Structure formats: structure tokens, C-alpha cells
Amino acid sequence: MLRVAVPNKGSLSEAASAMLSEAGYRQRRDSRELVMVDPDNDIEFFFLRPRDIAVYVGRGTLDVGITGRDLLLDAEVEAEELLPLGFAASTFRFAGPVGDFASAEELEGKRLATSYDGLLRGYLAERGINAKVVRLDGAVESSVRLGVADAIADVVETGNTLKAAGMEIFGDPILKSEAVLIRRAGGTTNGTAKEVDVLIRRLQGVLVARQYVLMDYDIRKELVEKAAALTPGLESPTVSPLRDSDWVAVRSMVPKKETNRIMDELYDLGARAILVSSIHACRI
């Protein structure tokens, strides 16, 4: 049975469970449940703190897990990323008092507060920057005002909290993070490789289904090539004959975010009966 770690709370939890549900896996109905078995798919889910998931997977206690890329790197364990999942995006950045710093190199000899000391130490070591890392469990924005640190390194989404604390972002991003599927480095060791492959394919199918729609339309034969240039699909659009031999029906997958633009251009080209359908699931 495949053993999978899922975040039990926070911004990762709801989105991870929704994605697994879309992939056809049973998910818990009570947020107090810590373990749930899906017998139909021969899989067992363990709901854990997001920060602990990389540790369990890295030690081989669990086969795979969903966590943040930032949490994976911060854990400094023998686990590797299998698949980016497209949600919980964030950026790990340096911030300091307005006007005090312009680049990471200026942090030499300074005190840096963070909740991600493993990730930060690795970044500083790669660049040969000697700075004192001060680990805090949260509210690192207050550390500079309280005299604990000269600057901070933290996950930034909007930057509003930093501005309220009289701070600004500086330097290049330390890391661009999102939710990821991870496994122990070197692969699973308990004969679950096939089940992991199925899980990856299903999650990839959800990602594609979220990013694309199916577009159907009718168009005159002589305009098919021009229409196909607008809707090339993943390999090629499907073209089917109609009762009126001068016309054909075309079906193609198109990026969801470009749907209305493509519909407008097809209509201007001469296409009619343009319809769009959602994709529930797919295998590409």
C-alpha cells in the first residue's frame, strides 16, 4: 500500500486535498482525522504538519508527500522533488529597513532572522556570505525593530506586512516556491514505484485539465489551416466531416486563459457554433 503525506493545515492543506480528490482519491471529511485509507486505490494518507512532511519522506517512513519547495529545502533531508503542483506559490526574499541594503552581498557580518534557517544557511554558503542566522518560529518582521536582527529572510506574498513594519525587499529572490510532490532521494524502496507513477500521472492529468479547455467549432474547409494555426492542440486538432461537405467540425485543446481571445479570432475568421467545454480529467 502506498503511504502518502498530506498537509494537515495551512494554505497547503485545502488545495492539496482538492487536487487529490480531483485525481480520484478519497479524502478525509473531518479535519481531525490524522490517517485515512482509500482501499479502492490501495493508498493510505497521513495528515501531518507541512514542515514535518519532508522529514518523514526523507527518512523513508512514508513513500511520497506534498509540501512546499521551501519546506523541502529547509528540512535538509534526503528527499527530492517529483512534480510541481501549481498552487501555494510564494517567494523567499531578503528584507530590511528602508534604504539600509541593496544586495545580499551587503549582509556580510550581519544578523539575519528567519524561520527557514536550513534554506538560508545553504543560500549564504553557496555565495560565500558570512552572516549570523537567527532562527525564529514566526513574526520575523518584528526582529529588526526589537534589535534581534539587522535584516530578515522570509516568505513574501504581497509585501504588505513588511511595509507596515517599515521594511523593504532587496536583492534577488532567494527561492521561488510552490507546492511539490516529493519522495525519498533515489526512489522508493518498498515496491511502490508503480503506484507512485500512477499518482504522478493522475496529478499531471489534473494540472492539464485545470490549464486547458476543449474547444469545438465549425468552419469552411478552405479555412481549416488558418483555424488550426489558432487552435493547434497538443499534437493536432481533430477535424471531422459534416453533412455539408463544404464545412468541417474541429475539436482542439486550448489554454484556458486564452479562451476568449481565440474564440474572437475564430469568429472573425469565419468559424461558427464555437463551444467550450471543461476538462474533468485527462492523460497526456
UniProtKB/Swiss-Prot annotation:
Catalysed reaction equations from the record: 1-(5-phospho-beta-D-ribosyl)-ATP + diphosphate = 5-phospho-alpha-D-ribose 1-diphosphate + ATP
GO biological process terms, semicolon-separated: L-histidine biosynthetic process
Key words, A-Z: Amino-acid biosynthesis, ATP-binding, Cytoplasm, Glycosyltransferase, Histidine biosynthesis, Magnesium, Metal-binding, Nucleotide-binding, Transferase
Gene3D superfamilies found in the cross-reference section: 3.30.70.120, Periplasmic binding protein-like II (3.40.190.10)
Cofactor: Mg(2+)
Molecular function per GO: ATP binding; ATP phosphoribosyltransferase activity; magnesium ion binding
Enzyme Commission number(s) of this protein: 2.4.2.17
UniProt activity-regulation remark: Feedback inhibited by histidine.
Pathway the protein takes part in: Amino-acid biosynthesis; L-histidine biosynthesis; L-histidine from 5-phospho-alpha-D-ribose 1-diphosphate: step 1/9
Family: Belongs to the ATP phosphoribosyltransferase family. Long subfamily.
Record function comment: Catalyzes the condensation of ATP and 5-phosphoribose 1-diphosphate to form N'-(5'-phosphoribosyl)-ATP (PR-ATP). Has a crucial role in the pathway because the rate of histidine biosynthesis seems to be controlled primarily by regulation of HisG enzymatic activity.
Protein name (Swiss-Prot/TrEMBL): ATP phosphoribosyltransferase
